[in-house]
Amino acid sequence: RHDPIDTCTLFLLMRTQVAYLGPKGTYAEQAAGALAKLEKLSEPEFIPYSSLMTVVEHLANKDCEAAVVPIENSVEGGVTATLDSLWTFQDIFIKRALILPIRHALISSGHTHEISEVLSHPQALGQCSQWLRENLPNAIQLPTNSTSEAVRMVKGSRFRAAIASKELSSIQGVNTIAFPINDVPGNCTRFVLLSNKEVPNDGSEDIASFAFSL
């Protein structure tokens, strides 16, 4: 005898779980939504994790069916945390790639002249380094796990600011005090959709990446 599965439970079981670097509002979430549409995933369920290593680890352990991670930025180059994760965990395959334009904002409850600390993901700090040198030369730069985490940490503080997207400013209810602040107007990041199932070769042109140690 088998217990019946109700319609709601069956629907949840059929959804494709997609891991990404959260929390909500990050560039990774935007990329995850776009890649899920390109891949034509049916009713994807997006699951945020606190670090890129954790995202790839959950995929490798088959806790989810897909993952979206940033792999390369046009200004800062390869995303080290992603590359290290792909080196650490075996049998991870790239299904699709997407280039997402990146436009950063300075977000704070204070004014620019009050800011003494700037928080963000290391990649975002690097992409705005020249702007920070020219406009906030004395501010201490503090790395966080994600741009969304940075905005949460500065909310309510007049001497702290975060670098993140304007969308996060609206989501978290914190003011945008400067935009755009990225050093390169054409700043963009390549995100990839990862799978723990081997991707069949359909005869189209592929891009191969090689990693080695000395």
Identify the role of each PLM range.
Residues 5, 11-214:
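Domain-level signature for soluble enzymes in the chorismate/prephenate branch of the shikimate pathway
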